[in-house]
């Protein structure tokens, strides 16, 4: 056995968690069954654990004899020969990656096995690889705009700040979706965070609401305070990408249900284990939509939600 295989074996023996079946101590003796799933990625955060637990529970109930091999990126499996060895020396039926780092680690391997990406945002990247699919964490722009119309039915002009290089394609899709929904869409380019103050002042004079499209240039820890304060001062509601922003003063955000995403991803895995090609399974958005509301912000902006909107919220800050 090579040194790299011995190192990988130690990693697997230390990190593997089997819900069904047993693991032999030698990597060469793994002999992965047709119903084996290698789960690659860190599971330190609560939502990651919830996602993986839900994924496994679904498959255990659906697939008799399914086995899971958990490998954490913290064991440097993505930066050593370990991942190459398991792919080269074992016929891996399926890999589930947890998070974008794990996803990219598998894509860097030659002849990567069928892959389902969990907890990643990049649907476009998934679509580039015929041997990969998954459930992305972000809702399609069509879904997000439809929810703006549902929660704020009187707001007709939607504004967005975006970096053309990072988000140009999504903004183009959003413009088309807004037109179909009868909404006016105003997009303001931002090439660097330093341009945000002027861009916001210009945009806020022309829109009813600011939609927080996830964009690495526009939305970050460094820009959060300025965006929230400008929104509050101009009384233009900010629709945020997460409940953390809502707690800090944004009006609302759409949320994902990690347990449901685990089941949704598990359904994809079941199809692959039963013989369906990954290339025939299109990437999906989360099918369950949850949202958080900030009633303090709504009161400041003299907004009133319908009773159904308030009662339907997964989380309410007041």
What is each residue range found by the language model?
Residues 2-16:
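Bacterial N-terminal signal peptides that target proteins for export
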Residues 8, 21-22, 33, 148:
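Low-complexity, intrinsically disordered/propeptide-like segments
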Residues 9, 22-23, 63, 87:
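Generic low-complexity, intrinsically disordered sequence content enriched
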Residues 19-29:
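C-terminal segment of classical bacterial N-terminal signal peptides
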Residues 28-318:
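Short hydrophobic alpha-helices and adjacent helix-cap/hinge residues
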């Amino acid at each position: 056995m090579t040194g790299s295989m011995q190192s990988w074996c130690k990693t697997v023996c230390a990190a593997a968690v089997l819900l069904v079946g047993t693991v032999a101590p030698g990597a060469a003796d793994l002999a992965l069954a047709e119903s084996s799933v290698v789960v690659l990625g860190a599971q330190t955060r609560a939502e990651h654990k919830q996602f993986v637990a839900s994924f496994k529970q679904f498959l255990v109930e659906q697939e008799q004899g399914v086995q899971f091999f958990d490998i954490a990126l913290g064991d440097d499996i993505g930066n050593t020969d370990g991942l190459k060895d398991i792919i080269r020396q074992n016929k891996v039926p399926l890999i589930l990656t947890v998070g974008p780092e794990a996803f990219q680690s598998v894509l860097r391997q030659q002849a990567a096995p069928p892959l389902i990406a969990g907890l990643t945002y990049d649907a476009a990247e998934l679509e580039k690889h015929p041997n990969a699919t998954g459930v992305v964490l972000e809702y399609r722009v069509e879904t997000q705009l439809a929810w703006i119309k549902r929660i704020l039915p009187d707001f007709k002009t939607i504004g967005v700040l975006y970096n053309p290089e990072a988000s140009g394609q999504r903004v183009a899709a959003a413009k088309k979706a807004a037109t179909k929904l009868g909404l006016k869409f105003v997009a303001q380019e931002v090439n660097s965070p330093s341009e945000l103050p002027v861009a916001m002042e210009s945009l806020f004079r022309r829109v009813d609401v600011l939609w927080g499209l996830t964009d690495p240039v526009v939305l970050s820890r460094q820009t959060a305070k300025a965006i929230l304060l400008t929104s509050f001062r101009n009384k233009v509601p900010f629709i945020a990408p997460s409940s953390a922003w809502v707690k800090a003063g944004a009006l609302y955000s759409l949320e994902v249900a990690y347990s449901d995403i685990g089941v949704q991803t598990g359904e994809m895995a079941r199809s692959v284990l039963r013989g369906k090609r990954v290339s025939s399974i299109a990437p999906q958005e989360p099918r369950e939509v949850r949202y958080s509301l900030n009633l303090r912000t709504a009161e400041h902006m003299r907004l009133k939600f319908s009773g159904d909107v308030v009662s339907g919220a997964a989380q309410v800050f007041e």
